[in-house]
Amino acid sequence: MELRDLERIEEFRQVVELERQIWGVDYDDVVTVPILTVTVKRGGVLIGAFDNDRMIAFVSSLPGIKDGKPIQWSHMLGVLEEYRSAGLGRALKLEQRRRSMKIGCDLVEWTYDPMQAANAHLNFVKLGVVVEEYAINVYGESTSRLHKGTPTDRFVAQWWIREPHVARRVESKSAVVIRTPEAARPIGSLSKAAFQAA
């Protein structure tokens, strides 16, 4: 397995094909080769995961400005179905974090479907995101087989990539961090009583 920056038109075409395979979207809803090209040339992050020479996953973010400071807007993280639940999404996000820090960003944001439990687990447990915004039907009608016919309501995830709580999350082997007045303490599992106390 290899993770690497994507820089060539042929690789961008593979990303477009992965978008169609992963989400089942029409060409109306894909991020196109010209947009991926500009993204890479103007400060975005585009990383692919390869199994031998086959691209099996990718993460893409666009440069942006929020409150006068540079951020990355992570628009897509996609993994082919047969490669899911093996830590590949997390590995891609950690690479995205490294590159975002290198170019001077403190914040990476993205939206995710609150009905997708696996995404919530990755975002909160593995990465340490916070959510302060719920966006109503943010993308309008989608051609995706996953979202077709439903509103595209989303949480807006904020990933403060230099913050200590994020460093603890991405370096932790535990499942959950519970914040207490004294300090944050990692635990291996979360009982119902502990969850209610949190």
Where are these regions (language model features)?
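C-terminal "cap" of GNAT-fold acetyltransferases
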Residues: 137-170
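Conserved catalytic-core motifs of GNAT/GCN5-like acyltransferases
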Residues: 111, 121, 128-145
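A conserved beta-strand-loop-helix scaffold within acyl/acetyltransferase catalytic domains
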Residues: 1-81, 135
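Conserved acetyl-CoA binding element of GNAT-fold acetyltransferases
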Residues: 70-81, 174-189
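Conserved GNAT acetyl-CoA-binding A-motif
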Residues: 100-113
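Conserved acetyl-CoA pyrophosphate-binding loop and the N-cap/start of the following alpha-helix
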Residues: 83, 87-95
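A conserved acidic, glycine/proline-rich C-terminal tail/linker
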Residues: 187-198
